[in-house]
């Protein structure tokens, strides 16, 4: 059954038109008003912190409150602080050099709000992945329509009521619904469309945006590999791999998806990962800090991927725990040497399952990574900086971390985004501000300017100026 009726489409269009009109009335939202908007986002995040944790717990069944605090609430508070601190300098016009034959004059770039922007967000970090692009769009002076995920209804309702406390609907509006609503949402002629979600839906969104020539940012997924070099102490790998993989039960776009270790080291890495995760969650089944899988559909998909690898002869290592009952929890799992053609090695896993395979040297590892779609993140484990750099040079990914996982996400001055099938465009910090603004080129000349000398009738002065 469709989750959309004609009334909803009309309402969505009406909100869009109201935002358009409001934007026309305030094309250059003043600095002080943008600061108010940023402060409102920060204040809402802090004020509703407990409600955000409750909503995430209700949507996932079990969602670690500490992980919600870390990855949704604290992240947003610090992103808002960063934006507030730097907005003034981001908004300044940027002067550029004027070539000698065009002098005198002033050339500069004005960063201007694009207008009404659409944001579509996923379920895995349902608060942060909606609020973070909203923050960037508001800092840029835009109006925002958000379509959050249908898989996290409690969080979507909460965000709608939170935002209504501080923003009129003609400034920030939330449209609730599933794929059909999403499809109608993407048909509106936004000034920018910002999509976070799967590569499959990213293609659909991109086509819809193209109909209106709407510029689009695609924050997608993919299989983010870990490449380990010979000089890395394999017994230490689990310390960081376990955190990267089992945070939010692996439902993280930049979670390490699979690991390629040197020959003879996969078992050590697997055992150190299981040992670390066992220490983190002595009984993962009852531990409130070990998150559940978001829906029955996702739960069944992950279990069937593990079973497929088991039937194909791969060795499965799992952390010990009691029976999770109906909690939709999957034991932290490591799979040794699954076949390359198994779903675990073909699809983005997006759950608490980590395949570990061996490579035949770094050239082989890079070749195998490069044979797949370009990943969102790539992790290099190498003691030697030279080795790490050679892996960076031999591969392409949206972002990368050396000797750790995921931490690049929290460095606000780094652009966050994918490349190829893992996305295009970026945000965070100034990159988010740039995404939602248009770089308008301005060249100011005096009333009489020597450029008149290159106008017809062409003659000696023209020849002199244009001589190559
Ligand atoms: P999804 O693509 O299923 O859904 C994302 C959003 O798109 C939801 O709001 C959904 O309702 C909407 N949608 C679904 N069909 C649509 C359509 N036809 N037209 C318009 N909108 C539609 O993704 P998901 O399952 O929520 O998220 C998981 C994926 O997102 C993973 O691949 C993950 O790697 C990726 N992801 C990427 C990032 C990133 O920052 N790059 C962050 C989180 C998740």
Region locations from a protein language model:
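N-terminal Rossmann-like NAD(P)+-binding subdomain of aldehyde/semialdehyde dehydrogenases
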Residues: 1-108
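Residues at or immediately preceding the N-termini of alpha-helices
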Residues: 12, 31, 49, 234, ...
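Conserved C-terminal structural/oligomerization subdomain of aldehyde/semialdehyde dehydrogenase
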Residues: 2-3, 30, 227, 322-323, ...
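Structural signal for hydrophobic packing residues in well-ordered secondary-structure cores
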Residues: 23, 27, 42-45, 49, ...
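Residue-level signal for inorganic ion chemistry
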Residues: 34, 80, 141, 172, ...
């Amino acid at each position: 059954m469709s989750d959309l009726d004609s009334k909803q489409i009309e309402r969505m269009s009406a909100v869009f038109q109201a935002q358009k009109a409001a934007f026309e009335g305030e094309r250059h939202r003043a600095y002080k008003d943008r600061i108010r908007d940023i402060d409102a986002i920060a204040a809402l995040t802090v004020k509703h912190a407990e409600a955000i944790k409750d909503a995430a717990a209700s949507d996932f069944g079990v969602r670690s409150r500490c992980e919600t605090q870390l990855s949704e609430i604290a992240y947003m508070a610090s992103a808002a602080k960063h934006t507030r601190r730097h907005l003034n300098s981001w908004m300044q016009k940027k002067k550029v050099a004027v070539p000698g034959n065009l002098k005198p004059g002033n050339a500069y770039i004005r960063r201007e709000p694009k207008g009404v922007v659409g944001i579509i967000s996923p379920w895995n970090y349902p608060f942060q992945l909606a609020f973070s692009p909203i923050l960037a769009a508001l800092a840029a002076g835009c109006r925002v329509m958000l379509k959050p995920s249908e898989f996290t209804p409690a969080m979507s309702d909460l965000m709608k009521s939170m935002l209504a406390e501080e923003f009129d609907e003609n400034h920030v509006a939330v449209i609730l619904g599933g794929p059909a609503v999403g499809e109608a949402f993407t048909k509106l002629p936004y000034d920018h469309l910002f999509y976070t979600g799967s590569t499959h839906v990213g293609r659909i969104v991109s086509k819809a945006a193209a109909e209106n020539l709407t510029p689009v940012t695609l924050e997608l997924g993919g299989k983010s590999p870990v490449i380990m070099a010979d000089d890395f102490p394999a017994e230490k790998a689990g310390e960081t791999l376990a955190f990267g993989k089992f945070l939010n039960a692996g439902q993280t776009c930049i979670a390490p998806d699979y690991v390629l270790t040197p020959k003879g080291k996969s078992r050590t890495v697997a055992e150190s990962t299981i040992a670390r995760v066992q220490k983190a969650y002595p009984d993962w089944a009852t531990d409130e800090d070990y998150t559940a899988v978001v829906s029955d559909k996702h739960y069944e998909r992950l279990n069937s991927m593990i079973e497929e690898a088991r039937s194909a002869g791969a060795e499965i290592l799992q952390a010990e725990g009691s029976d999770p009952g109906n909690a939709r929890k999957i034991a932290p799992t490591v799979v040794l040497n699954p076949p390359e053609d198994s779903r675990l090695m073909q699809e983005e896993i997006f759950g608490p399952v980590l395949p570990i395979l061996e490579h035949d040297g770094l050239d082989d590892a890079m070749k195998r990574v490069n044979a797949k779609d370009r990943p969102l993140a790539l992790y290099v484990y190498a003691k030697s900086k030279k080795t790490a750099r050679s892996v960076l040079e031999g591969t392409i990914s949206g972002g990368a971390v050396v000797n750790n996982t995921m931490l690049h996400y929290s460095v606000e001055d780094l652009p966050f985004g994918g490349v190829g099938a893992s996305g295009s465009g970026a945000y965070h910090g100034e990159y988010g501000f740039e995404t939602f603004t248009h770089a308008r080129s301005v060249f100011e000349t005096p009333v009489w300017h020597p450029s008149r000398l290159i106008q017809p009738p062409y003659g000696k002065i023209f020849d002199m100026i244009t001589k190559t």
